[in-house]
Swiss-Prot record:
Subcellular location, record wording: Cytoplasm
Protein name, UniProt field: Crossover junction endodeoxyribonuclease RuvC
Reactions performed catalytically: Endonucleolytic cleavage at a junction such as a reciprocal single-stranded crossover between two homologous DNA duplexes (Holliday junction)
Species per Swiss-Prot/TrEMBL record: Nautilia profundicola (strain ATCC BAA-1463 / DSM 18972 / AmH)
Active-site residues from the entry: D7, E64, D137
Keywords: Cytoplasm, DNA damage, DNA recombination, DNA repair, DNA-binding, Endonuclease, Hydrolase, Magnesium, Metal-binding, Nuclease
Length: 154
């Protein structure tokens, strides 16, 4: 089963595609860099990026839910990105699953309060990856895909 994991962001949107059989394997990972200045063009850039990475062989899509932020403007902008992303996934795939950062951290590290670096360490360990994976948006997206693989018991 192929799973697309997505870590939404307003500057970088991490993505990862994993295969679950015969064992968890990383197929592709990266990020969509948002460089436009105006919101409408940023959203368009995000959608174009999703269209470039999505292919019909993907069986499941999992997206990390919005985290709590102190700045209301940040939350609002992230919610707009998340809404555009959700709509596009529904249009091209039909459905998706959502996981909170707490659920993802707990699934991958056993600790819902783990730091991003701890998540990255465990992602590399689970997949047997040597070396660094940068930026951390990518390891977060991989962690979302791993979390989904555990939930659907593939």
């Amino acid at each position: 089963m192929k799973i697309l994991g997505i870590d939404p962001g307003t500057i970088k949107c991490g993505y990862a595609i994993i295969e679950t059989k015969p064992k968890l394997t990383l197929i592709d990972a990266g990020f969509i860099k948002i460089t436009e200045k105006e919101l409408q063009y940023q959203l368009s850039q995000l959608i174009e990026g999703i269209d470039m990475i999505y292919d019909s062989s993907i069986d499941e899509v999992a997206i990390e839910d919005i985290f709590f932020a102190y700045n209301p403007k940040t939350v609002l902008k992230l919610a707009q990105f998340r809404g555009a992303l959700s709509l596009r996934i529904l249009q091209i795939h039909g459905n998706f699953s959502e996981y909170t950062p707490l659920q993802v951290k707990r699934a991958v590290t056993g600790n819902g309060k783990a730091k991003k670096e701890q998540v990255a360490f465990m992602v590399k360990r689970i997949l047997g990856i040597k070396g660094d994976i940068k930026p951390l948006d990518i390891t977060d997206a991989i962690a979302v895909a791993i979390t989904h693989s555990q939930r659907v018991k593939c």
